[in-house]
Protein backbone atom coordinates (compact mmCIF):
# COMPACT_ATOMS: atom_id res chain seq x y z
CA UNK A 1 0.00 0.00 0.00
CA UNK A 2 1.41 3.35 -1.07
CA UNK A 3 -0.54 6.62 -0.98
CA UNK A 4 -0.06 9.85 -2.91
CA UNK A 5 -1.72 13.07 -1.71
CA UNK A 6 -2.08 15.61 -4.50
CA UNK A 7 -2.42 18.99 -2.82
CA UNK A 8 -0.64 17.83 0.31
CA UNK A 9 0.71 21.24 1.27
CA UNK A 10 -2.70 22.88 1.67
CA UNK A 11 -5.13 23.10 4.57
CA UNK A 12 -6.54 19.58 4.45
CA UNK A 13 -3.53 17.93 2.82
CA UNK A 14 -0.96 19.07 5.37
CA UNK A 15 -3.01 17.59 8.23
CA UNK A 16 -3.92 14.43 6.31
CA UNK A 17 -0.28 13.75 5.42
CA UNK A 18 0.79 13.93 9.07
CA UNK A 19 -2.16 11.76 10.14
CA UNK A 20 -1.52 8.98 7.62
CA UNK A 21 2.22 9.04 8.33
CA UNK A 22 1.57 8.62 12.06
CA UNK A 23 -0.65 5.62 11.27
CA UNK A 24 2.27 3.90 9.58
CA UNK A 25 1.02 4.37 6.03
CA UNK A 26 3.58 4.86 3.26
CA UNK A 27 2.48 8.29 2.06
CA UNK A 28 3.95 10.89 -0.26
CA UNK A 29 2.73 14.34 -1.18
CA UNK A 30 3.00 16.60 -4.21
CA UNK A 31 1.43 19.90 -5.07
CA UNK A 32 1.58 23.51 -4.04
CA UNK A 33 0.50 26.77 -5.61
CA UNK A 34 3.59 26.79 -7.84
CA UNK A 35 3.20 23.27 -9.24
CA UNK A 36 0.69 21.63 -11.57
CA UNK A 37 -0.40 18.07 -10.85
CA UNK A 38 -1.70 17.80 -14.41
CA UNK A 39 1.95 17.40 -15.42
CA UNK A 40 2.45 14.23 -13.35
CA UNK A 41 3.29 11.31 -15.62
CA UNK A 42 1.92 7.78 -15.89
CA UNK A 43 5.11 6.14 -14.69
CA UNK A 44 5.26 8.23 -11.50
CA UNK A 45 1.56 7.73 -10.77
CA UNK A 46 1.71 3.98 -11.38
CA UNK A 47 3.71 3.38 -8.19
CA UNK A 48 0.77 4.32 -5.91
CA UNK A 49 -2.12 2.11 -4.84
CA UNK A 50 -4.20 5.09 -3.66
CA UNK A 51 -4.25 8.68 -4.90
CA UNK A 52 -6.00 11.32 -2.78
CA UNK A 53 -6.87 14.35 -4.90
CA UNK A 54 -7.25 17.55 -2.88
CA UNK A 55 -5.74 20.04 -5.35
CA UNK A 56 -7.96 22.42 -7.26
CA UNK A 57 -10.01 25.59 -6.96
CA UNK A 58 -11.18 25.08 -3.39
CA UNK A 59 -13.82 27.74 -2.72
CA UNK A 60 -16.63 29.72 -4.31
CA UNK A 61 -14.54 32.89 -4.40
CA UNK A 62 -11.56 31.09 -5.95
CA UNK A 63 -13.89 30.33 -8.86
CA UNK A 64 -15.59 33.74 -9.07
CA UNK A 65 -14.41 34.87 -12.48
CA UNK A 66 -13.99 33.25 -15.89
CA UNK A 67 -15.06 29.59 -15.80
CA UNK A 68 -12.08 28.36 -17.82
CA UNK A 69 -9.59 28.27 -14.93
CA UNK A 70 -11.70 26.38 -12.35
CA UNK A 71 -13.02 24.06 -15.07
CA UNK A 72 -9.51 23.08 -16.16
CA UNK A 73 -8.28 22.66 -12.59
CA UNK A 74 -11.28 20.88 -11.06
CA UNK A 75 -12.73 18.87 -13.95
CA UNK A 76 -10.31 18.47 -16.84
CA UNK A 77 -7.36 17.65 -14.58
CA UNK A 78 -9.42 14.99 -12.77
CA UNK A 79 -10.31 13.43 -16.12
CA UNK A 80 -6.66 13.42 -17.14
CA UNK A 81 -5.64 11.87 -13.80
CA UNK A 82 -8.13 9.03 -14.21
CA UNK A 83 -6.92 8.37 -17.74
CA UNK A 84 -3.27 8.24 -16.58
CA UNK A 85 -4.06 5.61 -13.92
CA UNK A 86 -5.62 2.14 -14.11
CA UNK A 87 -8.05 -0.27 -12.45
CA UNK A 88 -5.51 -1.44 -9.88
CA UNK A 89 -5.45 2.01 -8.30
CA UNK A 90 -8.03 3.84 -6.18
CA UNK A 91 -8.63 7.56 -6.57
CA UNK A 92 -10.21 9.38 -3.62
CA UNK A 93 -11.20 12.92 -4.57
CA UNK A 94 -12.59 15.99 -2.83
CA UNK A 95 -16.12 16.85 -3.88
CA UNK A 96 -18.32 19.17 -1.82
CA UNK A 97 -21.70 19.21 -0.11
CA UNK A 98 -22.32 22.39 -2.10
CA UNK A 99 -23.54 20.12 -4.93
CA UNK A 100 -26.89 20.21 -3.11
CA UNK A 101 -27.31 23.87 -4.06
CA UNK A 102 -28.47 26.83 -2.00
CA UNK A 103 -32.14 25.89 -1.50
CA UNK A 104 -33.20 24.51 1.88
CA UNK A 105 -35.86 22.13 0.55
CA UNK A 106 -35.12 18.99 2.62
CA UNK A 107 -34.31 18.36 6.30
CA UNK A 108 -31.24 16.32 5.29
CA UNK A 109 -29.67 15.84 1.88
CA UNK A 110 -28.48 12.33 1.00
CA UNK A 111 -26.00 11.19 -1.62
CA UNK A 112 -28.85 10.58 -4.06
CA UNK A 113 -29.73 14.30 -4.08
CA UNK A 114 -27.90 16.68 -6.38
CA UNK A 115 -28.81 20.11 -7.74
CA UNK A 116 -28.36 20.96 -11.39
CA UNK A 117 -29.47 24.57 -10.88
CA UNK A 118 -26.60 26.94 -11.58
CA UNK A 119 -25.49 28.74 -8.42
CA UNK A 120 -21.83 29.57 -9.06
CA UNK A 121 -18.78 28.26 -10.92
CA UNK A 122 -17.50 26.30 -7.92
CA UNK A 123 -20.69 24.27 -7.62
CA UNK A 124 -20.80 23.79 -11.39
CA UNK A 125 -17.35 22.20 -11.36
CA UNK A 126 -18.12 19.99 -8.35
CA UNK A 127 -21.40 18.70 -9.83
CA UNK A 128 -19.59 18.02 -13.12
CA UNK A 129 -16.79 16.29 -11.24
CA UNK A 130 -19.24 13.97 -9.48
CA UNK A 131 -21.06 13.15 -12.71
CA UNK A 132 -17.76 12.38 -14.41
CA UNK A 133 -16.70 10.19 -11.49
CA UNK A 134 -19.97 8.26 -11.68
CA UNK A 135 -19.31 7.65 -15.38
CA UNK A 136 -15.90 6.16 -14.60
CA UNK A 137 -17.28 4.14 -11.67
CA UNK A 138 -19.84 2.67 -14.07
CA UNK A 139 -16.96 1.62 -16.31
CA UNK A 140 -15.30 -0.26 -13.46
CA UNK A 141 -12.84 2.30 -12.11
CA UNK A 142 -12.05 2.44 -8.38
CA UNK A 143 -13.09 5.97 -7.43
CA UNK A 144 -14.44 7.39 -4.17
CA UNK A 145 -15.95 10.87 -4.07
CA UNK A 146 -16.15 12.72 -0.76
CA UNK A 147 -18.77 15.43 -0.42
CA UNK A 148 -17.19 17.40 2.39
CA UNK A 149 -19.18 19.55 4.73
CA UNK A 150 -17.41 22.83 5.50
CA UNK A 151 -14.03 21.67 6.77
CA UNK A 152 -12.83 23.23 10.03
CA UNK A 153 -10.21 22.49 12.65
CA UNK A 154 -6.56 23.03 13.40
CA UNK A 155 -3.89 22.17 10.82
CA UNK A 156 -0.26 23.09 10.06
CA UNK A 157 -1.76 25.26 7.29
CA UNK A 158 -5.09 26.65 8.49
CA UNK A 159 -7.68 28.46 6.41
CA UNK A 160 -9.02 31.36 8.45
CA UNK A 161 -11.83 32.09 5.97
CA UNK A 162 -13.89 29.02 7.01
CA UNK A 163 -16.73 29.37 9.48
CA UNK A 164 -15.42 28.16 12.86
CA UNK A 165 -11.81 28.93 11.98
CA UNK A 166 -12.83 32.48 11.06
CA UNK A 167 -14.97 33.13 14.14
CA UNK A 168 -12.26 31.87 16.47
CA UNK A 169 -9.59 33.92 14.69
CA UNK A 170 -11.50 37.20 14.93
CA UNK A 171 -12.50 36.47 18.53
CA UNK A 172 -8.91 35.78 19.62
CA UNK A 173 -7.05 38.42 17.64
CA UNK A 174 -9.60 41.13 16.80
CA UNK A 175 -11.92 40.73 19.82
CA UNK A 176 -15.15 40.49 17.85
CA UNK A 177 -17.45 37.85 16.37
CA UNK A 178 -19.54 39.16 13.49
CA UNK A 179 -22.24 37.02 11.91
CA UNK A 180 -24.86 37.19 9.18
CA UNK A 181 -27.73 34.82 8.39
CA UNK A 182 -27.68 33.43 11.91
CA UNK A 183 -30.44 30.88 11.28
CA UNK A 184 -28.89 29.09 8.29
CA UNK A 185 -27.82 25.48 8.64
CA UNK A 186 -24.40 24.21 7.66
CA UNK A 187 -22.73 20.77 7.74
CA UNK A 188 -19.33 20.90 9.45
CA UNK A 189 -16.54 18.35 8.93
CA UNK A 190 -13.56 18.41 11.27
CA UNK A 191 -10.22 17.94 9.57
CA UNK A 192 -9.55 15.18 12.12
CA UNK A 193 -12.68 13.23 11.18
CA UNK A 194 -11.92 13.81 7.50
CA UNK A 195 -8.45 12.32 7.92
CA UNK A 196 -9.73 9.36 9.91
CA UNK A 197 -12.34 8.71 7.21
CA UNK A 198 -9.72 8.68 4.46
CA UNK A 199 -7.54 6.38 6.57
CA UNK A 200 -10.52 4.02 6.98
CA UNK A 201 -11.15 3.98 3.23
CA UNK A 202 -7.53 3.20 2.47
CA UNK A 203 -7.11 0.46 5.05
CA UNK A 204 -10.47 -1.20 4.38
CA UNK A 205 -10.05 -1.07 0.60
CA UNK A 206 -13.45 0.61 0.33
CA UNK A 207 -15.42 0.06 -2.86
CA UNK A 208 -16.22 2.82 -5.34
CA UNK A 209 -18.90 5.18 -4.07
CA UNK A 210 -19.77 8.77 -3.26
CA UNK A 211 -20.15 9.71 0.41
CA UNK A 212 -21.33 12.69 2.40
CA UNK A 213 -18.82 13.50 5.15
CA UNK A 214 -19.91 15.69 8.07
CA UNK A 215 -19.07 15.51 11.76
CA UNK A 216 -22.31 17.36 12.58
CA UNK A 217 -24.83 19.89 11.30
CA UNK A 218 -25.28 23.20 13.08
CA UNK A 219 -26.40 26.79 12.58
CA UNK A 220 -24.40 29.99 12.35
CA UNK A 221 -25.97 31.21 15.59
CA UNK A 222 -25.16 28.01 17.51
CA UNK A 223 -21.56 28.06 16.34
CA UNK A 224 -21.14 31.74 17.23
CA UNK A 225 -22.59 31.17 20.70
CA UNK A 226 -20.12 28.39 21.47
CA UNK A 227 -17.17 30.41 20.16
CA UNK A 228 -18.36 33.32 22.30
CA UNK A 229 -18.62 31.08 25.37
CA UNK A 230 -15.03 29.88 24.94
CA UNK A 231 -13.47 33.24 24.08
CA UNK A 232 -15.67 35.59 26.16
CA UNK A 233 -16.15 37.84 23.13
CA UNK A 234 -19.50 39.40 22.24
CA UNK A 235 -21.37 38.64 19.01
CA UNK A 236 -22.44 41.32 16.52
CA UNK A 237 -25.40 40.29 14.35
CA UNK A 238 -25.40 42.05 10.98
CA UNK A 239 -28.69 40.53 9.85
CA UNK A 240 -29.33 38.57 6.68
CA UNK A 241 -27.64 38.80 3.30
CA UNK A 242 -28.75 36.95 0.14
CA UNK A 243 -26.96 34.04 -1.50
CA UNK A 244 -25.83 32.04 1.54
CA UNK A 245 -25.87 28.25 1.54
CA UNK A 246 -28.50 26.82 3.87
CA UNK A 247 -28.72 23.04 4.18
CA UNK A 248 -27.83 20.02 6.30
CA UNK A 249 -26.59 16.63 5.09
CA UNK A 250 -27.10 13.02 6.10
CA UNK A 251 -23.82 11.33 7.08
CA UNK A 252 -25.29 7.87 7.66
CA UNK A 253 -24.07 6.15 4.50
CA UNK A 254 -20.37 6.12 5.31
CA UNK A 255 -21.02 5.41 8.99
CA UNK A 256 -22.80 2.21 7.96
CA UNK A 257 -20.75 1.06 4.95
CA UNK A 258 -17.43 2.14 6.45
CA UNK A 259 -18.24 1.08 10.03
CA UNK A 260 -17.12 4.60 10.89
CA UNK A 261 -17.78 6.82 13.90
CA UNK A 262 -17.39 10.60 13.76
CA UNK A 263 -15.59 11.70 16.90
CA UNK A 264 -15.70 15.49 16.78
CA UNK A 265 -18.53 17.80 17.81
CA UNK A 266 -18.95 21.57 17.89
CA UNK A 267 -17.23 21.97 21.25
CA UNK A 268 -14.24 19.80 20.35
CA UNK A 269 -13.69 21.57 17.03
CA UNK A 270 -13.79 25.01 18.66
CA UNK A 271 -11.33 23.82 21.31
CA UNK A 272 -9.06 22.38 18.62
CA UNK A 273 -9.04 25.61 16.59
CA UNK A 274 -8.28 27.71 19.69
CA UNK A 275 -5.41 25.37 20.57
CA UNK A 276 -4.06 25.57 17.02
CA UNK A 277 -4.04 29.37 16.85
CA UNK A 278 -2.63 29.79 20.36
CA UNK A 279 -0.02 27.06 20.56
CA UNK A 280 0.73 25.45 17.17
CA UNK A 281 2.02 28.44 15.18
CA UNK A 282 0.18 27.46 11.98
CA UNK A 283 0.61 29.04 8.59
CA UNK A 284 -2.58 31.09 8.27
CA UNK A 285 -4.03 31.41 4.77
CA UNK A 286 -7.15 32.78 3.09
CA UNK A 287 -8.57 31.26 -0.09
CA UNK A 288 -11.10 33.89 -1.10
CA UNK A 289 -9.59 35.40 -4.25
CA UNK A 290 -9.99 34.26 -7.85
CA UNK A 291 -7.17 31.95 -8.91
CA UNK A 292 -5.97 32.20 -12.50
CA UNK A 293 -4.93 28.76 -13.72
CA UNK A 294 -3.51 28.47 -17.24
Regions flagged by a language model, labelled:
Residues 66-80, 116, 120, 124-125:
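Glycine-rich NAD(P)-binding loop of the Rossmann-fold in SDR/ketoreductase-type enzymes
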Residues 79-121:
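Conserved Rossmann-fold NAD(P)-dependent oxidoreductase catalytic core, especially the SDR/UDP-sugar
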Residues 100-101, 120-121, 144-162:
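Flexible, glycine-rich beta-alpha linker
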Residues 105, 117-147, 172:
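Active-site Tyr-X1-5-Lys
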Residues 174-175, 179-294:
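C-terminal substrate-binding subdomain of Rossmann-fold SDR/epimerase-dehydratase oxidoreductases
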